[in-house]
Amino acid sequence: THLDTGAMYRVITWGLKKENIDIDDISSVNSFLEKTNISYKNANEIMLNGKLLSTEIRKKDITSNVSAVSALLEVREFLVKIQRKLGNEIDCVIEGRDIGSVVFPNADFKFFLTADLDVRSMRRKNELKKLGEDLSIDEVKASMLRRDRIDSSREFSPLKRSEDSIEIDSTDLTIDEQIEKIIKIIKKK
């Protein structure tokens, strides 16, 4: 099973926007979280209070707001609790910007994937195009730089590589090659 924790932050962002909740209004954010149920229809189909949101959460308006939402301590604590519960209940690969450093600091295997900004931007542009959003490469690159800056400098659980993680540069690797490389490393240990 694969758990994309970034999707969880995107779902919360979508829900807050849908309810017109200002993220600076922490009382309203907390009220929203209290009535929030995140579940999965299938491994990669995330739901918020029973509504399937797999494609809506990948769109530009969510992407441009998710870093600000994920910087909120209340949101992080709420989602980390869910992530730890799921991670302890099932065998899974968990993907996220603070999994190895905060959520599961004692995980058996930790990989930190990197890639050249131009390659990451093109991958994201192609992903957005599949969702019907045709942004310029410069727009995508600017969005990624902004998100990286916000996520790396946030007060709670900033994006950072844990010292005991294995860094893999995926710039010149396909998804299958990345998986193959990770499996080889796991089998060696």
Question: Residues of each region from the PLM?
Answer:
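Conserved beta-strand scaffold positions in the cores of enzyme catalytic domains, especially
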Residues: 2, 110-112, 165-168
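ATP-dependent NMP and nucleoside kinases share a basic, alpha-helical "lid"
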Residues: 54-66, 70-131
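Residue-level signal for inorganic ion chemistry
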Residues: 6, 50, 79, 93, ...
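C-terminal alpha-helix
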Residues: 181-189
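Small-molecule kinase domains that catalyze NTP-dependent phosphoryl transfer to phosphate-bearing small molecules
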Residues: 32, 43-44, 83-90, 97, ...
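N-terminal phosphate/diphosphate-binding loop that engages ATP/GTP or pyrophosphate donors
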Residues: 1-58
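Charged, alpha-helix-enriched surfaces in structured cytosolic catalytic cores
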Residues: 3, 7, 24, 28, ...
